[in-house]
A protein has these predicted regions:
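Membrane-proximal transmembrane or re-entrant/amphipathic helices at the cytosolic face
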Residues: 301-347
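Interfacial segments at transmembrane-helix termini and the short loops linking adjacent helices
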Residues: 166-200, 313-314
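Interhelical loop/hinge segments that connect adjacent transmembrane helices in multipass membrane
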Residues: 25, 44-83, 271-286
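Interfacial transmembrane-helix starts/ends
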Residues: 70, 106, 127, 139-168, ...
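Interfacial/gating helices of multi-pass transporter permease domains
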Residues: 25, 30, 67-72, 94-114, ...
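Hydrophobic alpha-helical transmembrane segments
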Residues: 2-15, 22-49, 229-233, 247-268
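Helix-loop junctions and terminal segments of transmembrane helices
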Residues: 121-139, 148, 211
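Alpha-helical transmembrane segments of multi-pass membrane transporters/permeases
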Residues: 1-16, 199, 206-239, 248-251
Length: 347
């Protein structure tokens, strides 16, 4: 629940301040604070205390438990992963194109992160304790099977999100951000960046789960070192694609970089554990890709069919709502007919 609550509070903060006539980023900032307190602290604290967590009177520095924790956490503290620095790259390279592109990239990236938070981060957070317990019990085969199943679910959901965001990129950005000085031209630019960002959603989803798999096996250094290397290699990719495609190139560089990072993690995982973690992934992607593409096409057609019924914010919300419902209905129907969900659940 933590990433879902965190992202929802950010969105809610922005909407509340906008309704009060303040189009600045202050509402999003308050949403970050509220989401961090409610999602990342209070929910976790309540759950931990229900499970019997109690604060000891004192923890000596020589405690083996404390030493083990520090050794496990050290790689995460020292590493500069692409996942952490991707936002900074967008801001740094975006400023080279001017103030407008920086905001456009930021809004497009925020929109892309919503389905990642709802699907991938939530799945990763939920799966990690279970995967860790299986490793501690020596059930490595069962752990790998569970991870593979979770990956299949995330891939299916990510493909649907990608198709829907690409099809509804313009009305989505318009509904969320087009007000004040952020006009139609900014919406078009941000929507074009969102298309390239959205292509990377499946890779973000797989990365979130694969990283948890390494963490569950206490191989903390692997995703950190690979992520740090990916960060270094990402810099020339950003430079080249920015020169070629401007704002869209920066978004595409993000997708290319996270794709390379994810593929590298997958190759290392296969080398260490065998190919079972990827069991059925190809079949699942094959059965999910066609329904997702058709669903995206349906969303685009419906959104364009209703675009003249209302203008401005109301019209954009209408397009997103009707297009989203059309995408969901078409995908569920076509996926059921093609046996997509059966391929996901089969081990």
């Amino acid at each position: 629940l933590a990433p879902i609550v965190y992202n929802l509070m950010i969105i809610l903060g922005g909407l509340l301040m906008t309704d009060q006539g303040d189009p600045s980023a202050e509402g999003f900032a308050w949403g970050v604070l509220a989401g961090a307190i409610l999602g990342n602290f209070l929910i976790q604290a309540v759950g931990a205390f229900r499970e019997g967590l109690r604060f000891p009177s004192g923890v000596p520095l020589s405690s083996p438990v404390l030493r083990e924790y520090l050794l496990l956490a050290l790689p995460l503290m020292l590493g500069q992963s692409l996942v952490v620095l991707d936002e900074s790259f967008a801001r740094v390279f975006g400023t080279q194109l001017g103030e407008g592109p920086t905001s456009q990239l930021g809004f497009a990236r925020q929109t892309m992160l919503v389905p990642i938070g709802v699907v991938a981060q939530a799945a990763g957070v939920a799966a990690y304790p279970y995967l860790s317990r299986l490793v501690e019990e020596g059930k490595l085969r069962e752990m790998t099977t569970s991870l593979a199943r979770a990956l299949r679910y995330v891939i299916v959901a990510s493909l649907v999100a990608t198709a829907a965001l690409i099809a509804l990129s313009v009305p989505t950005i318009r509904a969320l951000f087009e007000r004040g000085q952020f006009g139609p031209a900014d919406t078009a630019a941000a929507a074009s960046a969102l298309v390239f960002y959205a292509i990377g959603i499946p890779f973000w989803g797989v990365q979130q789960l694969l990283a948890r798999g390494f963490y569950a096996r206490r191989q903390m250094w692997t995703p950190v070192l690979v992520g740090t290397a990916a960060t270094v290699l990402a810099v020339p990719i950003y430079i080249i694609l920015k020169e070629l495609l401007d704002i869209r190139g920066i978004a595409l560089a993000s997708t290319v970089s996270i794709a390379g990072y994810t593929i590298a993690l997958a190759v290392i995982w296969i080398d260490r554990t065998g190919t079972h973690v990827l069991a059925g992934l190809g079949q699942t992607m094959g059965r999910a890709l066609i329904p997702a593409v058709v669903a995206g096409g349906a969303a685009w057609l419906v959104a364009h069919a209703v675009q003249d019924l209302a203008a401005g914010f109301t019209g954009a919300v209408l397009q997103v709502a009707t297009g989203g419902l059309a995408a969901a209905a078409v995908f569920l129907g076509l996926a059921g007919w093609m046996g997509t969900m059966k391929a996901v659940s089969d081990d």
